[in-house]
From Swiss-Prot:
It is found in: Secreted. Coiled coil: none annotated. The modification Phenylalanine amide is found at residue 13. This is Temporin-1SPa. The keyword Secreted applies. Antimicrobial peptide with activity against Gram-negative and Gram-positive bacteria and fungi. Also shows hemolytic activity. Expressed by the skin glands. Keywords: Amidation, Amphibian defense peptide, Antibiotic, Antimicrobial, Cytolysis, Fungicide, Hemolysis, Secreted. It comes from Lithobates septentrionalis. The keyword Secreted applies. GO terms for cellular component: extracellular region.
């Protein structure tokens, strides 16, 4: 689950 969050954050940041 955390991997999905970091993936999305990486897309914005």
């Amino acid at each position: 689950f955390l991997s999905a969050i970091t993936s999305i954050l990486g897309k914005f940041f």
